Amino acid sequence: MDALTTYPGSITHRQPLFRLSAHPTHHRIMNVTVDPNALAVFLADVRDIDVQNLQYVPFMRHHLADLLVERLGDDFADMLVELVKDRRHGGFTIGLQDLSQDPSDFVKFGTAIGHILGPSNHDAMSGTYYARFVVKHTDNSDSYLRQAYRLFTMHTDGTYVSDATDWLLMMKFAEQNALGGESRFLHLDDWEERDRFVNHKLGTRPFFYKGSDSKNVSEQIERPLFFQSEFGLSISFIDQFVQPSNREETAFLRALSRSMEASAGTKEVSLPVGGLVVLNNYFYLHGRAPFQPNESLVRELMRQRGSFAY
């Protein structure tokens, strides 16, 4: 078996209530399939927990994680954490398998998955621990997030906030008349020109980041592009919010961004409605391909970001 699809040592390849398999379109992230009966019981368990309760009471989010682990076992939780921390993989996809179309169930399932990894960050854009947003034909926002027909360039999350952003979760809530718009992922170790930028004199020099007005974050953060973390070589970058101070820095950042976009290691991944993806934010960059123009285009997504509990 290829080293990139070898399962982490403590992970059992097949369990009665869940199955781990290679992702059909990405050579690193894995696909997790859960027994639908166990998943249906979890949805019944959380039926009377309302979303506002989750927004107001942080421990209820962890309670959802406990309820999911009760149905699927500690091995399931250990597997998810290990997948995201393992540099060979660093992420997974999982979904509700058409068991529900209720957005509240999507929030609860995504919250349970995220809080198996650890606590979520406050999302200043939405004012709570997650953000839901719609991409459609027209948009007048001040960032690429909702702009359907632009390339949403490769980036990491959490660049302009002081909170640790260890993991990122994105879940598809709805989609109509959408062609294109695939998620794009780049693992640092698959970027052919990485070392050219790491070894540049600006590669580890701090840059300032400042979010746009819609992000509702006033602080300005200074951080290097490349750095060492517990996961090895790591990156923090977003072209929209980094603030170069001269033409040399501008040329370097522009070349870095263009190199990532053109890399053969940048792969497209599609999600079904009710599906989600989790990535390690230290060594994955992510973006989105442009949609094909359609006046009736709608895609709704949920974002959660957080830190590892252990």
Regions found by a protein language model. Name each.
Residues 73-120:
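N-terminal functional module of multi-domain proteins
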Residues 100-147, 153:
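Long, hydrophobic, well-ordered secondary-structure blocks that form the structural core
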